[in-house]
Curated annotation (Swiss-Prot):
Gene Ontology molecular-function annotations: histone H3K4 methyltransferase activity; histone H3K4 trimethyltransferase activity; protein-lysine N-methyltransferase activity; RNA binding
Miscellaneous note of the record: Present with 172 molecules/cell in log phase SD medium.
Region (Binds SPP1): 762-938
Organism, scientific name: Saccharomyces cerevisiae (strain ATCC 204508 / S288c)
Protein name per UniProt: Histone-lysine N-methyltransferase, H3 lysine-4 specific
UniProt region (Disordered), positions on chain: 1-46, 54-73, 78-121, 646-729, 877-909
SUBUNIT field: Component of the Set1C/COMPASS complex which consists of SET1(2), BRE2(2), SPP1(2), SDC1(1), SHG1(1), SWD1(1), SWD2(1), and SWD3(1). Interacts with MEC3.
PROSITE patterns: POST_SET, SAM_MT43_1, SET
Similarity field: Belongs to the class V-like SAM-binding methyltransferase superfamily.
UniProt feature, compositional bias: Basic and acidic residues: 54-67, 693-712, 877-890, 899-909
SMART domains hit by this protein: N-SET, PostSET, SET
Phenotype reported upon loss of the gene: Abolishes cellular H3K4 mono-, di- and trimethylation. Increases the frequency of Ty1 retrotransposition.
Location of the region described as Binds SHG1 in the Swiss-Prot/TrEMBL record: 356-569
Length: 1080
């Protein structure tokens, strides 16, 4: 049916049921019973009209209905439709009528739309339903509207007032009959459009040619070039939609270039679960072999029951992997929608591929058997001239399979021509077997080695008889519990016999010397002697070649290349070296001269006071090549047996490093390294200035022009050669510096104004260094006019003497306090009254350093640990006493120093022995568990700390990035840790040692733990805490951030979260230069 007929009657509230039903034709168009197609009707009468309604609105309809008066069938068609009653059936309803049922738009009942042809009648039930519908009424079919407007009569197929409507030519005589055209003319400097009468003799021209658009034959357009068709927008499917619902299923299958052998079904399901809710998941197997095809059907559903959500999830899954494919667990899959029985086609395709592979394998096996039979027949015909060594009896099945399977090339050296039992990797991966399972099950056989290879598990035997015995007894009888299916699985072994076991004396292999070779058997004594003679001759020939090269060819070649034989070349070489040395010497002289000139230029008037802009900076260049040689010599000094700690750490796995017994090595390396750094450091600004071009000198203009100087009588400045030498010879303290801010000659002094806010006379005298300071002081005091009386002037000298004496007494008292107590006494600790009157009060931790020696932070680490044979460098008497008491005879044997690498190697061997014993026992037990971190920890000890309570100290020197100790404690869950923390606070335990490992695990070392819990916090720590995995469990390990000397306290940053309440913040007592003041 036409669009116009459907839309024109939509506003009337009811429809007419057409008697003729459209049917599908082969061309894809609707076909009516009278023989006319819908396309013919719409193509002949496709006109647009506008209609005015009474309410003033305007609507546009498509006039696709046939209204020609000449077509009798058309008039009969509309007359028939007008006489019938019932709902109108559009294209969608027409399609639904062929299915037998369509849903009514006016009731919840289903209406049969199976209509008869034009000459037939409707069914009884349908006629009864259609009679209940009200008759259709044309809204605009009134005389009042017909006389005013130009409407179309859909029943008669004619226009109202057709004869009364006139053209615009007949009504308006002012307009030209030939029409008008618009031109663009230049007027008043601007282009304007004008309308002109059109004459028939004027030929029309394409305006695009005037702008040069069509000169090349192609139309210039701004449309985007599309290389492919654009998909139409998806239309939501509802209850009024016709046709099948959108597909909610996807099919996942392996790509052609991917071999999918080891992937679980749950991995596929979990991957596609992110696109929507999966209601059905199915994996398909090969019906012939029951092996998985890795073809999956996934159906999406919606919790709300909306089919559009499920279809959208399936569509997004396909759209995501449409171009690049889907990669799951390293395997590539293709994803498509399940339409038009595509699932069955894919399954049949993969089944056919498997059948072809099986046929090919059978053909290869048949050919191998035929070839083997032919070889046996040929041997029988040749007779028994050569007798082969006897082999153990092998079953036909295992022997034939052994001849087909070969050892991988990378395992030839390890196998070394020995018998092997093989288990396929596909079978092992499917059931998640491991090498330890086979080791435990076959512990009663003489297996040489177990290898886990990408192609499977290989079990190597030293003797064929042992391999055959194991294969016959265990193949098909051995069962191992599957980790994927949770049931015992029968294991079938594949015996691979050695390939070269006949007439082979030496097996070429790259294996280690401890691998066992298969003994070679000879049939007769003559064969053995002949093979031995050949090998001896081969060895003698090889030795002879080496001897000739060393004794004859080598000396002859070296004698021919002697320098004395080529005097001309030597002369040329010496001449070149001499010229090179001269060039270097001249270059050094030029550089030295330039450096002096630049130094003189820096001290002239404009160099010192010419501004601080970057454009005025001169490029500082290093012209001395000797300095480079000097730095290179400094670097070579480090290679003479002493290297920095960083290099020692890098060589940890390559060479043996000895653990330093004292910190001399560290200090020696650090001193040389510091000297090298002082010589080799250069600022970034200098490097930028070196790269800057020398054109800046040319661009700089003279500060003053000679014309102006001559007019004003100013003499030109001439650099004084003698004056510059005086400046250079001056002390470095008084040399001027070209800086943005003037720098003082003397360093600034800080005065203690704690007890008094005024400076004493001694401080004032010490502050005045030279005459310039005295002049400045006079200028400052000139503004102050004191009232001087005879009494004050007479007592002035006495007051100066009194203040001077007070300062000296205070300095003397402070010196006594430092000498006796080690620090100054704080005035806050001085009691204002008697001790009994003051009572008990809490003293802050920062004040305890005045009377507790172990709470003081000094530059050298406080030695609170009593170490045997320890020497204090700061007490020479003690050093002499210990040296005299600890003297040993000169002929004593030097103590052997063990390296850290040897210790790690022995620990690894010990760990391997324990693992072997655990594998032999076969049961998981904690009796043989070994903590590897206990073997690698450094010697440490706890003692009283200068920071807080107890601390941890290093007994030996520790290099940077080395492990120190493990933080050991009781492993508890997070809720238990929170409960214990509250209990500790309630019981009065101020310090709780809770260390978080992850979100769910906390280590509590409060009551059960090691000495690592005594490590204190510091804002500038020398250690750090790391969480590593050892034996499958997370552990907290303390590592060194820098080189740590012996007897130095170990600290690390607690990294507490910032507390919002200031009262709950804990003060930090680390005393570091960058101390934050609080722990949290």
């Amino acid at each position: 049916m036409s669009n116009y007929y459907r839309r024109a009657h939509a506003s009337s509230g009811s429809y007419r049921q057409p008697q003729e039903q459209p049917q599908y034709s082969r061309s894809g168009h609707y076909q009516y019973s009278n023989g006319h197609s819908h396309q013919q009707y719409s193509s002949q009468y496709n006109q647009r009209r506008r209609y005015n309604h009474n309410d003033g609105t305007r609507r546009r309809y498509n006039d696709d209905r046939p209204h020609s008066s000449n077509n009798a069938s058309t008039r009969q068609y509309y007359a028939t439709n007008n006489s019938q009653s019932g709902p109108y059936v559009n294209k969608k309803s027409d399609i639904s009528s062929r299915r037998g049922m369509s849903q009514s738009r006016y009731s919840n009942s289903n209406v049969h739309n199976t209509l008869a042809s034009s000459s037939g009648s409707l069914p009884t039930e349908s006629a009864l339903l259609l009679q209940q519908r009200p008759p259709s009424v044309l809204r605009y079919n009134t005389d009042n509207l017909k006389s005013k407007f130009h409407y179309f009569d859909p029943i008669k197929g004619e226009f109202f007032n057709k004869d009364k409507m006139l053209s615009w030519k007949a009504t308006d005589k002012e307009f030209s009959e030939t029409g008008y055209y618009v031109v663009k003319e230049l007027q008043d400097g601007q282009f304007k459009f004008k309308i002109k009468h059109r004459h028939p003799e004027i030929k029309a021209s394409d305006p695009r040619n005037e702008n040069g658009i069509m000169t090349s034959g192609k139309v210039a357009t701004h449309r985007k070039c599309r290389n492919s068709l654009i998909l139409l927008p998806r239309i939501s499917y509802d209850r009024y939609s016709l046709g099948p619902p959108p597909s909610c299923e996807i099919v996942v299958y392996p790509a052609q270039d991917s071999t999918t052998t080891n992937i679980q079904d749950i991995s596929i399901k979990n991957y596609f679960k992110k696109y929507g809710e999966i209601s059905h998941f199915e994996a398909f197997n090969d019906p012939n072999s029951a092996l998985p095809l890795h073809v999956y059907l996934i159906k999406y559903a919606s919790s709300d029951g909306k089919i559009n959500d499920a279809a959208k999830a399936a569509f997004s899954a396909v759209r995501k992997h449409e171009s690049s494919g889907c990669f799951i667990m390293g395997f590539k899959f293709e994803v498509i929608l399940n339409k038009h029985s595509i699932l069955n086609n894919i399954i049949s395709k993969f089944v056919e591929i498997n059948v072809k592979k099986l046929q090919k394998l059978q053909e290869n096996l048949k050919k191998a058997k035929e070839k083997e039979a032919e070889n046996e027949k040929a041997k029988e015909l040749q007779g028994k001239d050569i007798t082969l060594p006897k082999e153990p009896k092998v079953d036909t099945l295992s022997h034939s399979s052994g001849s087909e399977k070969r050892i991988p090339y990378d395992l030839l050296g390890v196998v070394n021509n020995r018998p092997v039992l093989h288990v396929s990797k596909i079978f092992v991966a499917k059931h998640r077997f491991c090498v330890e399972d086979f080791k435990y099950k076959l512990r009663g056989y003489r297996c040489a080695k177990f290898i886990d290879h990408p192609t499977g598990i290989y079990i190597i035997f030293n003797d064929i008889a042992h391999a055959q015995t194991c294969s016959n007894a265990e193949s098909g009888n051995l069962t191992i519990m599957s980790r994927s299916r949770r049931i015992p699985i029968l294991i079938k072994f594949h015996l691979i016999l050695p390939r070269f076991q006949n007439r082979t004396r030496f097996n070429k292999s790259s294996s280690s010397s401890n691998s066992t070779n298969v003994p070679i058997k000879y049939e007769s004594k003559e064969e053995f002697i002949e093979a031995t003679a050949k090998q001896i001759l081969k060895d003698l020939e090889k030795t002879l070649h080496v001897d000739i090269k060393k004794r004859l060819i080598g000396p002859t070649v070296f004698d021919a290349l002697d320098h004395a034989n080529f005097p001309e070349l030597l002369a040329k070489r010496e001449l070149k070296e001499k010229e090179k040395r001269q060039q270097i010497a001249s270059k050094i002289a030029e550089d030295e001269l330039k450096r002096k000139e630049e130094a003189k230029r820096d001290f002239d008037l404009f160099g010192l006071y010419g501004g601080y802009a970057k454009s005025n900076k001169r490029n500082l260049k290093r012209h001395n090549s000797l300095a480079l040689d000097h730095t290179s010599l400094k670097r070579k000094k480090l290679s003479n047996g002493i290297k920095p700690m960083a290099h020692l750490l890098n060589e940890e796995t390559d060479s043996k490093e000895t653990t330093p017994l004292n910190d001399e090595g560290i200090t020696r390396v650090s001193k040389e390294h510091d000297e090298e750094d002082e010589n080799m450091t250069s600022s970034s600004s200098e490097e930028e200035e070196e790269e800057a071009p020398d054109k800046k000198f040319k661009s700089e203009s003279e500060p003053t022009t000679p014309e102006s100087d001559h007019l004003h009588g100013i003499k030109p400045l001439v650099p004084d050669q003698n004056g510059s030498s005086d400046v250079l010879d001056a002390s470095s303290m008084y040399k001027p510096t070209a800086t943005e801010i003037p720098e003082p000659v003397y360093p600034p002094e800080e005065y203690d104004l704690k007890y008094s806010q005024t400076l004493s006379s001694m401080d004032l005298q010490n502050a005045i260094k030279d005459e310039e300071d005295m002049l400045i002081l006079k200028q400052l005091l000139s503004t102050y006019t004191p009232t001087v009386t005879p009494e004050t002037s007479a007592a002035l000298e006495y007051k100066i003497w009194q203040s001077r004496r007070k300062v000296l007494e205070e300095e003397k008292a402070s010196d006594w306090q430092i000498e006796l107590n080690g620090t100054l006494f704080d005035s806050e600790l001085q009691p204002g009254s008697s001790f009994k009157a003051e009572g008990f009060r809490k003293i802050a931790d920062k004040l305890k350093i005045n009377y507790l020696p172990h709470r003081r932070r000094v530059h050298q680490p406080l030695n609170t640990v009593n170490i045997h044979n320890e020497r204090n460098e700061y007490t020479p008497e003690l050093c002499q006493r210990e040296e005299s008491s600890n003297k040993e005879p000169s002929d004593s044997v030097p103590q052997e120093v063990s390296s850290s690498r040897d210790n790690r190697a022995s620990n690894r061997r010990f760990q391997q022995d324990i693992e072997a014993q655990k594998a032999a026992i076969g049961t998981e037990s904690e009796l043989l568990s070994l903590n590897q971190l206990n073997k690698r920890k450094k010697p440490v000890m706890f003692a009283r700390s200068a920071i807080h309570n107890w601390g941890l100290y290093a007994l030996d020197s520790i290099a940077a990035k080395e492990m120190i100790i493990e933080y050991v404690g009781e492993r508890i869950r997070q809720p238990v840790a929170e409960m214990r923390e509250k209990r500790y606070l309630k019981n009065g335990i101020g310090s709780s040692y809770l260390f978080r490992v992850d979100e769910n695990t906390v280590i509590d070392a409060t009551k059960k733990g090691g000495i690592a819990r005594f490590i204190n916090h510091c804002c500038d720590p020398n250690c750090t805490a790391k969480i590593i995995k050892v034996g499958g469990r997370r552990r907290i390990v303390i590592y060194a951030l820098r080189d740590i000397a012996a007897s130095e306290e170990l600290t690390y940053d607690y990294k507490f979260e910032r507390e919002k309440d200031d009262e709950e913040r804990l003060p930090c007592l680390c005393g570091a230069p960058n101390c934050k003041g609080f722990l949290n």
